[in-house]
Amino acid sequence: MKFVDEAVIKVQAGDGGNGVVSFWREKFVTKGGPDGGDGGDGGDVYIQADENLNTLIDYRFQRFYEAERGQNGSGGNCTGKRGKDITLRVPVGTRAVDIHTNEIVAEVAEHGKKVMVAKGGWHGLGNTRFKSSVNRAPRQKTMGTKGEIRELRLELLLLADVGMLGLPNAGKSTFIRAVSAAKPKVADYPFTTLIPSLGVVSVVPEKSFVVADIPGLIEGAADGAGLGIRFLKHLERCRVLLHMIDIFPIDQSDPVQNALTIIDELEQYSEKLANKPRWLVFNKVDLVSEEQADEIIQEVIDALGWEEQYFKISAVNRQGTKELCYKLADFMEQLPREEQEVSEEEKVNFMWDYHPDANQGEVITEDDDDWDDWDDEEDDGHVIYVRE
């Protein structure tokens, strides 16, 4: 199945049902009181995480989703039926972003989580609501409010513990093939990896973690060069980043400049991502002598001002990969989980969260006969008082 990690859809919550003007009619009761019921609320639109899904491809074919409208009220003080909600099932790790405001409306990072993305309209009021001591035959009602309409960009963010980044052909896919059962395509030309892939690394039975391999970055990626920074979003939930550096590039480029390019693109994309724990991994050390490898590594470390630990590996013959995986597993075991979790969700303002204000909408009056005068004392007949 084709991997689709982004889709644009339009959702519309149901409109609220209208209130109704009605009066009680019964045998021998010529002037019954008001009994117009309220309308029903419109249905809401939700997204829900489903672990059985792994792509957003379905939302490329159908792009409009609408919840049910609330029923109008009816006589006998009958309230209209509430509109049915609609739930859109998405892969775990999906977030919904409002295209016009760039606001994150919803984010579902665990199976079964359900979040509202569009709120249904508020119901209209029937004429019973307007009855008072001075208005015993009200002909006023209110219409239901419109349901919320949003244009959303659905983004699928892969859930992984370790994210890999580097230039094309740095050896990221070769590494993930060496340490897991994943088999991403490997070749000697740039951008062999066109879509993200995941691999599960099992160090010992009770210790395992997930590694994400994304397409390589090049200079100018933040401005759209190459595959751009589209796939960097998949690293946002990773706990550790592995910066893979090729010490013997096939295009004979400078490893120092290559390392600086990746860091620059990372900082341009997101300060939060740039501040995540990051390890340097120097790959292809088997292609040069040990002295030459150490010299190149030292140049890179000096240029970056790197003071943390680093690793030397050869992914193709698995030299140093086992030690790296063990240290990654130990590090993540000690890393506080709070640093990995998404920050507490901000409150999203929906259209009709302020119900009291919705009631202050336009009031419609129906005047087609003299029903509103049946309680007028002046119509009770002409009475003459005589003082004796």
UniProtKB/Swiss-Prot annotation:
The EC number(s) this enzyme carries: 3.6.5.-
Cofactor: Mg(2+)
Biased composition range(s): Acidic residues: 364-380
Annotated residues for binding of Mg(2+): 173, 193
PROSITE patterns (alphabetical): G_OBG, GTP1_OBG, OBG
Domain OBG-type G: 160-333
Boundaries of every Obg domain copy: 1-159
Highest taxon in the source lineage: Bacteria
Subcellular location: Cytoplasm
GO molecular function: GTP binding; GTPase activity; magnesium ion binding
GO biological process, one term: ribosome biogenesis
Similarity comment: Belongs to the TRAFAC class OBG-HflX-like GTPase superfamily. OBG GTPase family.
Protein name, as recorded: GTPase Obg
Source organism: Vibrio vulnificus (strain YJ016)
